[in-house]
Amino acid sequence: TLINIRDTEEFVVNIVSEEFVEEMVACSTDFDSDVDEFEISGLTAAASQKITPPRVEKAKVSYECTLNQIIEIGDGKAGSGCVVIGTIVLFHIDDNIYDNGRILLNKLQPVGRIAGNEYTRLTNNFEIIRKIKPDK
């Protein structure tokens, strides 16, 4: 993925939902840059509108992005990596998870990778009211 981002200066961020987490894991290996991860995972590509790389059809939220910079962190040993910073040029939101200006997280059911083989899901949400402007 990183090689392709460097080469094209474009990328898509797809928010992974529980319904296709297994397919996502199937393509989360360090494949050579010429390997078609859609073919490996069984996911279907959907054409992007503003950039060349496709997005994941099943993704309920996708961001089409252009590259701003890549920041390398570490010395190349275990724990090192890169932070990719981009500009969102278009985002796609499934109408079924969007209501009155808000994304409905219970319908999106996003999954996040913590580290290694550990993942997390939103299951026990709670709300904390914060002040807009602190009192002095």
Describe the role of every protein-language-model region:
Residues 1-136:
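Basic, polyanion-binding surface patches
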